[in-house]
Amino acid sequence: MGAASSSIVRSEPFAGKLCGLEDVPENCITAMFMYMEPPEICLLARVNKSFHRASRSDAVWEDKLPSNYKFLVRRILEDQQQVGVKDKLIYRKKEIYARLCRPNLFDTGTKEAWLDKRSGKVFLAISPKAMKITGIDDRRYWEHISSDESRFGSITYLRQIWWLEAVGKIRFEFAPGKYSLLFKIQLGKPIRKCGRKTCSLDQVHGWDIKPVRFQLSTSDGQCAMSERHLDESGRWVYHHAGDFVVENQNSPVWVKFSMLQIDCTHTKGGLCLDCVIICPFEYRGKYKYSD
């Protein structure tokens, strides 16, 4: 019985041969990567040369990039090269994905775009410097304060004003989906006291009398509006202006947004405006927002 069993084992063509990861065909690895998130792909690229080569496949990364990635390359990456960002030209889809996942400034540094590393969804930030703001050039009303808390290196601080109107717009080719627009605001002036960051509330006033109106509209006729009193001092809050839906691929959309408090019966002041955020609707929960 033992001899018979031994002869059967020896007759098996693959007996005694163990298959390792190096034996997995590269096209199988590529197919597997199509179902994985980018961080997992980058981790598995270290396994061996076959995994590394498969992790660089354009077929894998074309599937991970947003449908509007060609627009992003033209609008953002090529714009950076024109203003002197010294990076080599990008050809592979993996390199495009990696570059777009960084914070990318464009439009003379007044706007920023980046991809979520896992989902490939697009996020935008718009600086107050890209907006029209009442009295912004008058130092009696406004000042720009350097801050490492800002995406743009500085925040816009309102000392005091009667009529507040901050309006901005952006023309952008969004991937189809639903998006939220939020204003990043803080009541109180950031200062340093005894070497520590703190917030002065000395000039905060007028925001509890009448509500602030946040609005957005799009070139295809969508509108949204919300009103609220600003009552959270000493910390950054994302105030939700509204949502809009993009249905058509490869079709640029104008998005106009504003923040208004134009009741001239009282002054208001002590407010910091950092930026406006446009994010996929399902990601707005990552921001501490007021609705």
Curated annotation (Swiss-Prot):
One of its GO terms (molecular function) is carbohydrate binding. Keywords: Nucleus, Ubl conjugation pathway. Residues 18-64 form the F-box domain. It comes from the Eukaryota. Pathway: Protein modification; protein ubiquitination. It is found in: Nucleus. PROSITE patterns: FBOX. GO terms for cellular component: nucleus. Transmembrane segments: none annotated. Its main location: nucleus. One of its GO terms (biological process) is protein ubiquitination. Pfam families: PP2. InterPro entries: F-box-like_dom_sf (IPR036047), F-box_dom (IPR001810), PP2-like (IPR025886). The F-box is necessary for the interaction with ASK proteins. Part of a SCF (SKP1-cullin-F-box) protein ligase complex. Interacts with SKP1A/ASK1 and SPK1B/ASK2. Component of SCF(ASK-cullin-F-box) E3 ubiquitin ligase complexes, which may mediate the ubiquitination and subsequent proteasomal degradation of target proteins. This is F-box protein PP2-A14.
